[in-house]
Structure formats: structure tokens, C-alpha cells
């Protein structure tokens, strides 16, 4: 896989999962499919712009991101409620690692 594609994926993910995620999306996506869907809609925007030529992959990433965040946001909320910061941050980093594994392995089938 070319380094340019790797960098594009990293940047798109950073923008979509970080910069475009509002506080309300972050705190409400574990409780509301509306806010989870709004987050995924915002998340996927940079991917649509950069990877417009493989929209099938972009759609697959939106679906997989929704499923993963549906699960992990609930786990993260539980750690926050019991004030277990170590497990919360371990869960966040694990979530991000899973996102990248999915992104990098799946794109190889589309390029």
C-alpha cells in the first residue's frame, strides 16, 4: 500500500473522528442512535471528499464505524460512570486501533 494512501486515511480519520465530532455527538452517541448517526455522517465526510472514486469502500467504512462506535461508546460510558480513567483511556486507544485495522485492511480490497 502506498504511503500516500496511508496518510490520507490517517488524516481523514483524524478529521472525521476528532475534529468534526462535536461534544454532543461524543457524549450522546452511546445513548442515542440519532447522535451516533450524526457522528458517522460527519465522520465520513472527509472520506467522501478524498476517496470519491471508491464510494463502496466509504459506505462500508460508515457502516462498520457505526457498528463499532455503537459498541465501544457504551463500554466507554460505563468506564466513565465508575470513574475508571485507566480503563476508559485503554478503551479509547483500543477503539482507535480497531478503527485503523479495519480501515487499512479493508481498503486493500478496493484499490
Model regions and ranges:
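Interhelical loop and helix-boundary elements at the membrane-water interface
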Residues: 9-43, 66-108
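Amphipathic alpha-helical interaction segments
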Residues: 48, 52, 56-57, 70-74, ...
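Transmembrane helix interruption/hinge and helix-loop junction motifs
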Residues: 1-4, 49-58, 111
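Functional transmembrane alpha-helices
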Residues: 58-67
